[in-house]
C-alpha cells in the first residue's frame, strides 16, 4: 500500500513495485487523477495490478473509513505500508484547516498517516510472511516506510521560494495543544508555511 501516487516519488514507485511482482493499493484524494497519472507510464496489464482507494488523509473520519475498507479487502495481503502523500503550500499567508480543525499539512503529512498506520498495523503484523514475487516464494517481514522530501532542494518548489523554515520541533507544544486554531506548528509557534510541521 502506498499513499500519494499522483506525482513524484509515489507515482514513480508504482512501476518498480509492479515489475517486482507486487500488487499495489494506491491511496489518493482522487482516484480519477491517480488513474490518469498512472496511465501515462503504465500498461493496462500493470494498471490491473493496482487497486485505487480514495482517502483524503486530512480528514481523520475518511482515514478510519478507508482503513476499514482496506482491512476488509486486503487483510491477509498487506505487506508494506509506504507513507508518501504530503501537501506543501509554502505561499500560504495563514494556515488551511482540516475538517477536524488541524493545520492541513500537519493533518495530511503526519496525523492522517499516523492514524492509518495504527489502524492497519495489526493487519501488517498478522499477514503471511511467505510471499510469491515473480514466481519465487520468499520470506518477508511486513514493514512501514515513511518518506519525506527535502524542501531546501532548489530544484523543488520549496527550494525556489525564499522562506526561512529551519527545522524546529521545540518542546512539541503543538502536540500538547492539539494543533487546533490558533496553533499550527509542531513547536507550538507562529505559522510558517515553508515548514510542513
Q: Where are the model-predicted features located?
A:
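Rossmann-fold NAD(P)H-dependent dehydrogenase/reductase core
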Residues: 1-197
Amino acid at each position: 500500500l502506498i499513499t500519494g501516487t499522483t506525482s513524484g516519488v509515489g507515482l514513480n514507485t508504482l512501476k518498480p513495485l509492479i515489475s517486482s511482482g507486487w500488487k499495489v493499493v494506491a491511496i489518493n484524494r482522487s482516484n480519477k487523477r491517480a488513474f490518469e497519472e498512472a496511465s501515462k507510464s503504465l500498461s493496462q496489464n500493470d494498471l490491473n495490478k493496482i487497486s485505487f482507494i480514495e482517502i483524503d488523509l486530512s480528514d481523520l473520519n475518511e482515514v478510519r473509513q478507508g482503513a476499514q475498507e482496506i482491512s476488509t479487502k486486503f487483510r491477509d495481503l498487506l505487506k508494506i505500508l509506504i507513507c508518501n502523500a504530503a501537501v506543501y503550500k509554502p505561499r500560504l499567508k495563514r494556515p488551511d484547516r482540516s475538517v477536524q480543525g488541524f493545520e492541513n499539512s500537519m493533518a495530511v503529512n503526519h496525523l492522517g498517516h499516523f492514524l492509518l498506520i495504527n489502524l492497519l498495523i495489526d493487519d501488517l503484523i498478522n499477514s503471511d510472511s511467505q510471499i510469491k514475487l515473480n514466481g519465487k516464494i520468499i520470506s518477508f517481514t511486513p514493514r512501514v516506510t515513511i518518506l519525506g522530501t527535502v524542501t531546501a532542494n532548489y530544484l523543488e518548489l520549496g527550494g525556489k521560494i525564499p522562506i526561512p523554515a529551519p527545522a524546529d520541533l521545540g518542546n512539541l507544544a503543538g502536540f500538547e495543544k492539539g494543533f487546533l486554531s490558533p496553533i499550527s506548528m509542531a513547536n507550538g509557534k507562529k505559522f510558517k508555511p515553508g515548514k510542513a510541521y
